[in-house]
Amino acid sequence: MERLRGPSPLENTTARHPAPLGPAHRDGLEPGTADRVWDVCVIGSGASGAVAADRLVRQGLDVLMVEEGFRLAPHVGLDEAESLSRQALARDGEGNWTDEGWPWTTSNLGGGTVYYGGASFRYRPFDFDPGELVHTDGVDVRWPYTLADLVPYYEVLERRLGVCGGDAPGIHRGSRHSRGPAHQPSPAARVLRAAGESLGYRPFPTPLAINRDPHGGRAACARDSLCVSHLCPTGAKGDVVAVFLAPLAAHPNFALRTGVRALRLEQDRSGEVAAVRCLDRQTGQAHRVRARVYVVACNAIQSAALLLRSRTPYSPDGVGNHSHLVGRGLCMKLSEYLSGTVDADPAVLADPYTNTGPFSTVAFLDHYLDPDCPGGFGGLIYESKRDQRHKLVHDALELRIETILADHPNLDNRVGLSTHLDEDGMPAVVIDYTPDPRDLDRLRYMTGRCERLLRTAGARGIRSRSTGFAQGSSHLHGTCRAGHDPARSVVDAWGRVHSADNVYIVDGSFMPYPGGLNPTLTIQAHALRTSRAIASHLAADRAAHV
């Protein structure tokens, strides 16, 4: 079988941080790893895995976290980080297969959070039960729990991450306010806000996990760089390395092992997993890691691929794939950028901070539920500053916005495994995704609303740019769907795999419906909810055997 060339860890030593994060961190697995049984093995160090590990460690459990990537050196920008990440087979815009699919944002310690913009929206009530407007064949889009069940976890995380900024007017009345004051709007955001208000919109500050003021032992944002292009130089952004993993790295009952890829889950009997087979990517040696519980937090593409690779005599189609739904129902969210320019005060154009700092400081949800939109529901519009990989406009102020909207779950959109092998000898990941025509109609409607907003702001030279969402995305959902019925879902309401009692999934895989907002905070809230349940279960089990 043909091998797809991927990055070798030994070729990328300049991108790796020369120092460990703390005493609990090292690259690779030491000899004798198989001799120990951990309370919990967390697979993946990104948005959800770090939250789960933090809760489990602080509940007194012995936790091993394995992460395929490495800790990045401070100078590594998004371009270089992307070049270190393994790609996947995917369809291009014409429907042809290419090897340029994106099965993650970046592959490194902290995952995509080290380059995300910090957008931290709470989902809306509609997102938990959209069935009145979202009609799909053979797919249950109702979540197995409600927004009210998740609100306490949102509140904890907003305080921990230092989320700053408000919410859409009238949303979540009655829940405690757990956010700090909003960041100052950018010059572009002020123009967009005024234009939106003239259209009858209700703009609000984009909620951001970025310190406006010092918080949690981390500095305030210095606006030194654009958050989506570079690692945060001050620690102000609430990426999971700064907020969760760095403090954990000094904890005696936590072990963080980077450069370790989870190849497959192994079973000695039906109904549970006995070990995870891991590859030390520096030495090329395989190790068997044992734990009482396994928390899978790789993202909605990589977690599905791990389960599909985990074929055993007890799970011949892959662990958790009893319903043949693992990998199916992949949702990416549709999105598009629109931009234009307006005249501005020369002092604003000369200000070096005009195009740095938070990527978004104003948002609009006036078309989230919109009877004029095809299907009756639209999505989000928000400021989205251009990252520094693209030429900035120096003789005018650029207004750049993005619209994001949920896609209809479709079982034919799926993650699969190829006959081609990757550089580690594993089946390459296949992303088979085709947008629903109904969603493309909704996207056209929303881009029209974006163009109207820009024209109202006086923008000229308006142009649009695709985000390439169909080939992969930083918003990944739905491949290990949650539900009460094991025949129609992969995991239960707590993220536990129906057919493997000691395996939990805490990333966006669990989402029955992707929601129309940036999902990171919601994924983290689910991870916190699930990890608290795991800790309670293990404590009860331990007490029963004393």
UniProtKB/Swiss-Prot annotation:
Glucosaminyl-6'-oxidase involved in the biosynthetic pathway of lividomycin by mediating FAD-dependent dehydrogenation of 6'''-hydroxyparomomycin to paromomycin. It is an enzyme of class 1 (oxidoreductase). Residues 1-30 are annotated as: Disordered. This is 6'''-hydroxyparomomycin C oxidase. GO terms for biological process: antibiotic biosynthetic process. Its cofactor is FAD. Belongs to the GMC oxidoreductase family. Keywords: Antibiotic biosynthesis, FAD, Flavoprotein, Oxidoreductase. Pfam families: GMC_oxred_C, GMC_oxred_N, NAD_binding_8. The active site is at H475 (proton acceptor). Pathway: Antibiotic biosynthesis; lividomycin biosynthesis. One of its GO terms (molecular function) is oxidoreductase activity, acting on the CH-OH group of donors, oxygen as acceptor. Its EC number is 1.1.3.-.
